[in-house]
């Protein structure tokens, strides 16, 4: 089947990282909408690999919503003590699913400055790199070390991290290869949303997503936070992989954004607090999005006078 190729002037992917309850879905959705409003027709804005237009937001986030059977089933598989010990292998395939989506995206949206008419910005929650770097180790902890069936787990081949790490290595290699299919001019911005894991756990319980609120434990949240910090490079690697081992580092910028000051716990200001968080994060992101054709006249003059 022939590929449906769309040529663009440039591509930028902003990847939002953070543990459950940090606000990834809220911030990414509103960031995409705000960029579309501010940047206008010169830009194509994507949210999780889908064009942001009409009801695309609701479709993209369907797996995260309370009414989504697919999302509910996956969350149940990961968290429910009665069945999670059976599903470690399946849980690791999330990385493979993301790899397939990213390869398709890279093959269909190609940078060609002479043929492309618009710039493309893709706003996403996680990607195959973070899935390989964090998810496999996180699922191993949750489905093996924190299993309610410790005797059964010891008898499994994948009850030993020395065996599971081969899956992580293979997925990490595949995730790295995805970046080889991207254009060398493509830029990646990693936005690390930071929070105290205890506060994040409280927010997860309150938001009431199916199975997540009832089955997630504070111990698992603490481990996810530990793995996320390893991925971010804030602490030494143990089972997680540092993002620099997966990305083309020279094409990456990073942002660290603390969300806790916006979660005041005051019901009367909750809506305003969330709006402030989204707006502030959007401003930080916008400043890091180098817009090639929107340089000020002064900047263009200085580039001419003092060429690099």
From Swiss-Prot:
<protein>
    <recommendedName>
        <fullName>Uncharacterized protein ORF44</fullName>
    </recommendedName>
</protein>
<dbReference type="InterPro" id="IPR027417">
    <property type="entry name" value="P-loop_NTPase"/>
</dbReference>
<keyword id="KW-0175">Coiled coil</keyword>
<feature type="coiled-coil region">
    <location>
        <begin position="212"/>
        <end position="242"/>
    </location>
</feature>
């Amino acid at each position: 089947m022939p590929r449906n190729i769309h040529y663009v002037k440039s591509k930028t992917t902003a990847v939002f990282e953070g543990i459950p309850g940090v606000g990834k879905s809220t911030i990414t959705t509103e960031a995409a909408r705000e960029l579309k409003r501010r940047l206008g027709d010169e830009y194509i804005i994507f949210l999780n690999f889908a064009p942001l237009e009409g009801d695309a937001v609701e479709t993209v986030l369907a797996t995260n919503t309370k009414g989504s059977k697919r999302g509910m089933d996956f969350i149940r598989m990961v968290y429910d003590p009665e069945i999670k010990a059976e599903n470690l292998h399946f849980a690791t395939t999330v990385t493979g699913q993301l790899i397939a989506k990213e390869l398709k995206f890279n093959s269909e949206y190609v940078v060609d400055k002479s043929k492309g008419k618009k710039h493309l910005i893709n706003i996403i929650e996680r990607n195959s790199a973070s899935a390989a770097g964090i998810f496999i180790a996180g699922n191993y902890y949750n489905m093996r070390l924190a299993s309610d069936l410790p005797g059964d787990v010891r008898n499994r081949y994948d009850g030993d991290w020395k065996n599971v790490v081969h899956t992580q290595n293979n997925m990490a290699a595949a995730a790295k290869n995805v970046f080889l299919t991207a254009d060398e001019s493509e830029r990646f911005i990693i936005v690390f949303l930071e929070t105290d894991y205890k506060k994040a756990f409280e927010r997860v319980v309150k938001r009431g997503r199916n199975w997540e609120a009832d089955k997630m434990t504070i111990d698992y949240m603490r481990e996810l936070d530990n793995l996320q910090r390893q991925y971010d490079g804030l602490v030494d690697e143990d089972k997680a992989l540092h993002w620099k081992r997966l990305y083309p580092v020279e094409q990456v910028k990073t942002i660290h954004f603390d969300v806790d000051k916006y979660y005041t716990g005051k019901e009367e200001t909750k809506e305003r607090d969330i709006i402030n968080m989204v707006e502030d994060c959007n401003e930080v992101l916008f400043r890091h999005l180098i817009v090639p054709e929107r340089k000020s006249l002064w900047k263009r003059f200085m580039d001419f006078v003092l060429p690099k």
